[in-house]
C-alpha cells in the first residue's frame, strides 16, 4: 500500500521556541536521510507586531532566526527554503494552506509535551494534526 510513498518535500513550522528548534533538527535530519527538500515556515500571528515599528524589529529577528536555520541545513547538505508569512487567518489554517499549495509530503512541528497533545485541543500542533493535508510528525 505504501510502496510508492515518497517524501520529497518536508515543511517544518516554526515559532522560535525550543520545541520548534527540535522540530528543525528532525526535519533537517529527515531531509538528509530521505534526500528531501525542507521548507522552514514561520508564521507571524495577525496583530503580533503592533505598532508598525515593532513589525520591522520583529521581522529582522525572525529573518535572523531563519538565517541560522539555513546555515544549519547547509552544513547538513540539505536544500532549505525559508519563508515568513503574516497570518491572515489562524496559524493552523495558514500552515495547512501552505502545505496544500506547496504539495508538502510531511509536516514537522514541535509540541511542548504529550499532555499538551492530549488535552489542549486548541494548540497549534493539535490543530495542524487535525487539519493538515498530509502526514504530520510531532516532535516533543
Predicted regions and their residues:
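Structural beta-alpha unit
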Residues: 1, 5, 75-107
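Small/aliphatic-rich secondary-structure junction motif
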Residues: 3-54, 72-76, 81
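Short secondary-structure boundary segments
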Residues: 42-43, 110-112, 140
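Alpha-helix N-cap and loop-to-helix initiation/capping positions
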Residues: 53-61
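Glycine-rich, Arg-bearing micro-motifs that act as flexible, cationic patches
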Residues: 106-131
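Short, flexible loop segments at boundaries between secondary-structure elements
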Residues: 134-140
